[in-house]
């Protein structure tokens, strides 16, 4: 595991022939056009530049490689890459990169497995690697009710403001999120303006405060428990 990179290298024991070339995956470089934070994030389109290693005893040239994945959270737009020549014991960057798209619904820290098949027209070698996807995870905590007359009791017919901690406990920032509240009670109306709880960004590991305005109906029975979503 490369700390902080989100890239896992799978431990695979390869039985190497005492002659000829043998190509394996060595590393991958993320090429990002948007966030540029060195990790693959939910909803991101990016390129992958692959690095291959020849652990055999002979060089290999004109190596075509095809990258695939059966993971439902990634789409590979063009998975074919080329290596001109890899000498024995050496590594080489691919001539071109592959384009991938990460689903917005990917769970935080979900490992995505990519399979690679290398071929020089005579021999074929198979390898794989994992990338961890990153996404925000939202939680709410510490609701505080401020009633209109500030006596600590939310009375029938009274307005109130609820302050709630909005927590992003995931490993990815979330830009332009909006927090909204829905009342599941016939006696409570949410009156907050739609744009009140729109943020530029909620960073990973950060807490922001949401503010919501509500009104209780004048006919609200005493002791009513209001369900809010």
State where each predicted segment sits:
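Intrinsically disordered, low-complexity Pro/Gly/Ser/Thr-rich segments with frequent PxxP/GP/PP motifs
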Residues: 75-106, 188-220
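Terminal connector regions
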Residues: 1-20, 99-137, 215-229
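Short acidic, flexible loop segments centered on an aromatic residue
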Residues: 51-74, 79-81, 167-188, 193
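Short, solvent-exposed loop/edge segments of extracellular or virion-exposed proteins
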Residues: 26-36, 142-150
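Short, solvent-exposed loop/linker segments at the N-terminal edge
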Residues: 35-44, 150-158
